Amino acid sequence: MAAKIRQNDEVIVLAGKSKGKRGKVTQVLPNGKVIVEGVNIITKHEKPVPALGKEGGLVKKEAAIDVSNVAIFNPKTNKADRVGFRFEDGKKVRFFKSNNEII
């Protein structure tokens, strides 16, 4: 099945502690999760690694969100939207379901 949410898509979070926030997808994981820039920030405790020159301490980073909890953001309607697939000129393309515009 083709991915409805892909890397560099602008998405909006539908559920969870980051509900309503928008961001760009930085990574799509194979287990059905996505990492969104600036969303679902966690604080991780890291040990120092002197051999690599890494300092220890508290590090803030983005955690993965299930793909069902995000929706693609449609800039024309300024709302979350659903994605459909269709063939145009022999190529499979994604489009917004609300206004039939190609993504």
From Swiss-Prot:
Alphabetical keyword list: Ribonucleoprotein, Ribosomal protein, RNA-binding, rRNA-binding
GO function term, MF aspect, one: rRNA binding
Coiled coil: none
InterPro entries (alphabetical): KOW (IPR005824), Rib_uL2_dom2 (IPR014722), Ribosomal_uL24 (IPR003256), Ribosomal_uL24_CS (IPR005825), Ribosomal_uL24_KOW (IPR041988), Translation_prot_SH3-like_sf (IPR008991)
UniProt cross-references to PANTHER family, sorted A to Z: MITOCHONDRIAL RIBOSOMAL PROTEIN L24
Assembly and interaction partners: Part of the 50S ribosomal subunit.
Record-given protein name: Large ribosomal subunit protein uL24
Lineage, highest ranks first: Bacteria, Pseudomonadati, Pseudomonadota, Gammaproteobacteria, Pasteurellales
Gene expressing this chain: rplX
